[in-house]
Amino acid sequence: MIILGIDEAGRGPLSGPVVAAGVILDQDKIIDGLADSKKLTEKKRQSLYQQIITHAKAYTIVEISPQQIDELNILQATLKAMHQVANNLERQFDKVLVDGNKLPNWDYNSEAIVKGDSKIIEISAASILAKVHRDNICLEHDRLYPQYGFAKHKGYPTKEHLENIKKYGVLDIHRKSYKPIQLLL
């Protein structure tokens, strides 16, 4: 059975997109060290990212913008991203396994698995792709807006991030539907 693993990164931050990734692994090309991206060092994630995009049978990465998150809400934006991931890889898999407890409204043979990123290697691989991709976006945001410190906090609502928003203002990349941002508008 060919499994498509899907996971997301970036539901909690105040800025940037939510990112979903899907991975179909090549059973003949074992990638050692796959685990939940949050349990890996940045260096290990980067190394595994390169191995995954090189050796996976198929993969895709989808971004949903802060503006779309504001229009839909974060749950619906995440489900939309996951749906788009599955559609991008349609007819290449037999079953979809998604990290978490919610599935998009779709007709695919699928299952939501709580802590799936720690249990299913395809979901672990998707977790790594989503996290590294999103972190790279945050590094680009840091280059564009160095005073905000995106390289450090990755958009999460840290004390430093909130103080920098108060000091320098709300950017287009901030999620205006999120309460901490609304309070600063």
Curated annotation (Swiss-Prot):
What's the catalysed reaction?
Answer: Endonucleolytic cleavage to 5'-phosphomonoester
| Sequence similarity | Belongs to the RNase HII family.
One matching Pfam family, short form?
Answer: RNase_HII
Main location (coarse class): cytoplasm
Q: What is this protein called?
A: Ribonuclease HII
Gene Ontology BP annotations = DNA replication, removal of RNA primer; mismatch repair
User: According to its UniProt entry, what is the function of this protein?
Assistant: Endonuclease that specifically degrades the RNA of RNA-DNA hybrids.
Origin organism of this chain? Francisella tularensis subsp. novicida (strain U112)
Could you state a single Gene Ontology molecular function term? RNA-DNA hybrid ribonuclease activity
EC number assigned by the record:
3.1.26.4
Coiled-coil residue windows: none
Q: What subcellular compartments does it reside in? A: Cytoplasm
Q: How is the cofactor bound?
A: Manganese or magnesium. Binds 1 divalent metal ion per monomer in the absence of substrate. May bind a second metal ion after substrate binding.
Do you know which PROSITE patterns this protein is assigned to?
Answer: RNASE_H_2
Task: Please list the residue ranges annotated as the RNase H type-2 domain.
Answer: 1-185
Q: Does the keyword Plastid apply?
A: no
**Disulfide-linked positions:** none
* UniProt entry keywords in alphabetical sequence: Cytoplasm, Endonuclease, Hydrolase, Manganese, Metal-binding, Nuclease
Write the signal peptide boundaries. Answer: none
> What is its cofactor?
Mn(2+); Mg(2+)
